[in-house]
Amino acid sequence: QQSEQLQQKQCQCTSNPRTGQLATAFRYSVEEDRRVYTINYNLNIFSTFIHAKTGVKLVFLLDTGADISILKENSDKFSNIQITNKINIQGIGQQKIQSRGQTFIEIQTGKYVIPHDFHLVDKNFPIPCDGIIGIDFIKKYNCQIDLNQEEDWFIIRPNNLKFPIYIPIAYSSGINTTLLPARSQVVRRLIVSSKDDNILIPNQEIQTGIYVANTIATSSNTFVRILNTTDSDQLVNMDTLKYEPLSNYNVVQANSEHRNKTVLSQLKKNFPELFKSQLENICSEYIDIFALESEPITVNNLYKQQLRLKDDEPVYTKNYRSPHSQVEEIQAQVQKLIKDKIVEPSVSQYNSPLLLVPKKSSPNSDKKKWRLVIDYRQINKKLLADKFPLPRIDDILDQLGRAKYFSCLDLMSGFHQIELDEGSRDITSFSTSNGSYRFTRLPFGLKIAPNSFQRMMTIAFSGIEPSQAFLYMDDLIVIGCSEKHMLKNLTEVFGKCREYNLKLHPEKCSFFMHEVTFLGHKCTDKGILPDDKKYDVIQNYPVPHDADSARRFVAFCNYYRRFIKNFADYSRHITRLCKKNVPFEWTDECQKAFIHLKSQLINPTLLQYPDFSKEFCITTDASKQACGAVLTQNHNGHQLPVAYASRAFTKGESNKSTTEQELAAIHWAIIHFRPYIYGKHFTVKTDHRPLTYLFSMVNPSSKLTRIRLELEEYNFTVEYLKGKDNHVADALSRITIKELKDITGNILKVTTRFQSRQKSCAGKEQLDLQKQTKEIASEPNVYEVITNDEVRKVVTLQLNDSICLFKHGKKIIARYDVGDLYTNGILDLDQFLQRLELQAGIYDISQIKMAPWKKIFEHVSIDKFKNMGNKILKNLKVALLNPVTQINNEKEKEAILSTLHDDPIQGGHTGITKTLAKVKRHYYWKNMSKYIKEYVRKCQKCQKAKTTKHTKTPMTITETPEHAFDRVVVDTIGPLPKSENGNEYAVTLICDLTKYLVAIPIANKSAKTVAKAIFESFILKYGPMKTFITDMGTEYKNSIITDLCKYLKIKNITSTAHHHQTVGVVERSHRTLNEYIRSYISTDKTDWDVWLQYFVYCFNTTQSMVHNYCPYELVFGRTSNLPKHFNKLHSIEPIYNIDDYAKESKYRLEVAYARARKLLEAHKEKNKENYDLKVKDIELEVGDKVLLRNEVGHKLDFKYTGPYKIESIGDNNNITLLTNKNKKQIVHKDRLKKFHS
């Protein structure tokens, strides 16, 4: 700063006779200049000059840290010293030194003379040379110190005069000392004695107060920055310097001004105008973390990926044929990958095919772009999974809080920023016409790539809080609730990118957005919505036409179930069609559900972000089919939804009582919303009042105890919400939180056990609560049942002038007069119900069924009876049986069936049984079953639309031949893999009597080839057959075969189309033969035709299951002689280059039998597997009581005897029982079943 101020002052030259020349600012009298000039030099470099007047060589220290230029005094060399211009100098230690004066000298190089004023100092001044060239000289002549070339130069402009530089070297071993001025930072040249070309000198303190900065060094030429923090000059020993080999690095070009401007220009395209200057500052500071597409992709410095396979056998897949027009594009892309060090040449035995796929076309360019893709499907089959959990989307969305701004950062070629382990690179090999290559980075297409990338990103950004940024794969979204918060979070994320050498794509980064689309969700500062870009897809989604399309639609909607009220209740109609063995029948319920689900996605409910500083509320309800829940929070006096949830009940849950279903809904909702509510107090609201009582019981049932224990860790309050105020639906469809009103006065509050432990006065409140809940019934005590049989056959309570209680509708167990309960012909309902419950209690009756006869209900409505009964009855339930309507008119019958069978909503053209069940619930007429059966049978739509079982004629017993080869069945196998002999098919002939098989390999199945094979290989060996049976293949249905049969007087029978039973005998042999061949050609596919005859021989010498004879024995009259040691077959070593045919034949027969035995074992295993699928085993232990099936009893005897106690359990499911007479009996487990006492 001093030198800049001094240079602004100029004066007339006094020492040079050339008047008018501007002199430097260092020519002042003592009175004028009292400032202190520093000469703390920070470069230990020197250069030699020639004094123009005397020709003496002068060695100067080039010091960019010195304010002035100085020269040691020597009376023999200099004269014309101006004593008046003295200054104070400080820098070598703390002592101030006054200069001797000032002199003007000229430096000469060639024909050029360079004049300058130097301040003279004593000859003992502590510098190891004649003087110092300071910043005044360097700025005056625009000098440059060039240390970047093979030779170092001190350059004086504008004439580019070059003076060589020499630097005293400090060695890292041996003689290694250097002098450091006090409180100064200097740069010293250093040579490190290391076998590594590139080394890292880490930040370290080499002696007290002396520090060395991080330095990337070479063993030959290195500059090190050293800091002396002490108050005295220090002689430093460099032997204590520590260094290490440099690894995991990339050589990149230094950031140039042009490059930085290009990056900023790309970033500015996505800068909002309001925050442009702030973003430009922060991006300029971290300009190095952004990469241009023209630059090589670097790798991160924290994680390498290793690939692990199931075995070491190389996977080699042939290349696909590429069009000639794409060859040039492939070579160009591969060369770029090589240049960017993403791939390298390979000599691996692995190979995966490559192909080009088109990229999405740009609207501004007509040129088609391609992406190079490697098909790693075969590698993926053997690649061991690299399991790392991807973050849950709902967990990410929950962390958005009250975010106001969103910034999206995109990694440049994310997978390619992960380096592959050296030992894993061969697995990724691929090849082109120019050679084979392998990836050095993680390639696209490997099944482990997403999880591996997620692991790397999670590690790299582990210090970033979810409230600052969230990531999913290569989507990195920074959030902020204010401008300052966003800039702070961006700075931290950018810092992580720099720390771990992660590069961002500047063109794909966006900042300070008010909404962003993330994984199909639109995140805004007001809430979360589905991505509206998918609305068109939802609107135009086709109606599912089969189970697969229905499954896809349900899966698509399931992705957005967070936004769909009553998702489970609606989707169950369509989900039912996705189950196995369920015929696909798109009903009106399915269509309504389909339309509703689409409309819910197109017009979604706006969900709120969870605010974890506020209390949550869960509102639940259940229907017979499903349960639902909504998580809400209070925002400005309104309960707004945070999340919806629903699920369909299982079959068992659907059959439970209303109370159990409502309880299950609360239990499931609390577990489901655990991430939101755990560790905080929350409220549960239900419109089922008995649940408030159940959660406050002192001694609950075992079932309730289990549920309460599971919820013991949660801190919540159960509140009863009156039905009229509860807009949470009995299924989730009726949840409409926006209409909830302030209902504080209508809520009965119940405290859970968690809170009761925190209250000192819980006892009195608990007693008051029990008093209240005694009046609460768990279910309605009087309800209606629409029935037919119950009214006509099973009435258990009937009123006339007296009450009659019946047992099973027959035996009267009680009768008593109720005449005293009538006043003016009207029954006193209150007294009647009390007496009814009393009388039922005498006979221990808890539930009765009642027909609403006129005697009671002519003056009392059913609703009044139900309301009164629910208030009075405590321990008795009454089912009111509504009688069905009797129909006699034919037109009414037709109208009823037209509605309940033909109507698309109420009928749906169901079958006879279902239609009859629907009609019986409401109506009755004589011979109704017969009438409905005839109506449905004659329904034209049912006859046309519904499938029926295919008819099958009884099996026909064909004529049995008298001699071998009288009747021969012929068929063709193929195409098979082309053998070395050129064969792809085989003609098979089997004798219908002996089951003797002949197989002939052929090159093709033309008529001529097939006819020649049959004639030469069968007829000339075994003689012509009497009957020749074939299918309708063109190789048999032609003139050549017809002429052959005519010439040899062979009867030719052809099967009908699609009726393979005619040639069933050969079809069954084909299955066995195919298993033989398939089991071998899995290892060698080119010599199946050689092995074919060995397998045929095995087939003919194996006993047939049809007649228990070997086909060979029936044809030749004797059994075939087989080597005796075949039954003791051990490991078989292959024999190659065998000249002895007998040995080779023996070997092939051994292999054939081994494979036959292997197939038989596999067949047994398959049979066991199929059998076990139908087995329902029971678990028994010693001490259990069981019942024993009675195998010798008569029809009227018990099917089981016992119970007996299990004494012991032995092998093979044998169990020892201890009978009632203390005798032991051993029985099989299949005869037992558990006894429930």
Curated annotation (Swiss-Prot):
Keyword annotations of the record: Aspartyl protease, Endonuclease, Hydrolase, Nuclease, Nucleotidyltransferase, Protease, RNA-directed DNA polymerase, Transferase, Transposable element
Reverse transcriptase domain span: 338-523
Catalytic activities: DNA(n) + a 2'-deoxyribonucleoside 5'-triphosphate = DNA(n+1) + diphosphate
UniProt-listed InterPro entries: Aspartic_peptidase_AS, DNA/RNA_pol_sf, Integrase_cat-core, Integrase_H2C2, Peptidase_A2_cat, Peptidase_aspartic_dom_sf, Retropepsins, Retrovirus_Pol_polyprotein
Chain ranges of the Integrase catalytic domain: 957-1119
Active site: 63 (for protease activity)
Record keyword Transferase present: yes
Gene3D superfamilies: 1.10.340.70, 3.30.70.270, Acid Proteases (2.40.70.10), HIV Type 1 Reverse Transcriptase, subunit A, domain 1 (3.10.10.10), Ribonuclease H-like superfamily/Ribonuclease H (3.30.420.10)
SUPFAM superfamilies: Acid proteases, DNA/RNA polymerases, Ribonuclease H-like
GO biological process: DNA integration; proteolysis
CC terms in the record's Gene Ontology section: DNA polymerase complex
Tree of life domain: Eukaryota
TM ranges: none
UniProt domain Peptidase A2: residue ranges: 58-131
MF terms in GO: aspartic-type endopeptidase activity; endonuclease activity; nucleic acid binding; RNA-directed DNA polymerase activity
The enzyme's E.C. designation: 3.4.23.-, 2.7.7.49
Presence of keyword Chloroplast: no
Protein name: Retrovirus-related Pol polyprotein from transposon 412
Organism (species): Drosophila melanogaster (Fruit fly)
